[in-house]
From Swiss-Prot:
Catalytic residue list: 130
Example GO BP: translation
Pfam families in the cross-refs: Pep_deformylase
Protein name, per record: Peptide deformylase
Protein's gene: def
Amino acid sequence: MYRVRVFGDPVLRKRAKPVTKFDEALKRTIERMIETMYHYDGVGLAAPQVGISQRFFVMDVGNGPVAVINPEILEASPETEIAEEGCLSFPEIFVEIERSKRVKVRYQNVRGEFVEEELEGYPARVFQHEFDHLNGVLIIDRIKPAKRLLLRKRLMDIAKSARG
């Protein structure tokens, strides 16, 4: 199992690098990430959240775990919806985030094969959330400044814990 990195850890702000090797080490890393995600009752976990600055994440929105490697969002619907999101890198913080209702995505699986699919509703939201992590974008970047100000003390406490 991995230790989940929390707000304040610099790895969360970096743009992750593409995965180039689809080997046993990647499979083991993904298995460990899935174990970590379930341990913390998450529905998604991006590699940067466990200190790995590479473009992949795992998610499970009810149909079993999926590894998403080198993802792209090909299309995002103009229709959006607002819903509450949490993040393992922001313990006990939940904020309302506006995201596209539908996305058309392409990614590679653990064998390096390309997968293309359309996601709607909750699966689309989770995909977009985890995709943000690969670009160094966090949930607090997607909320209004006034709301961020209200969370300032809690964010500072989390950042302090990241430094040990």
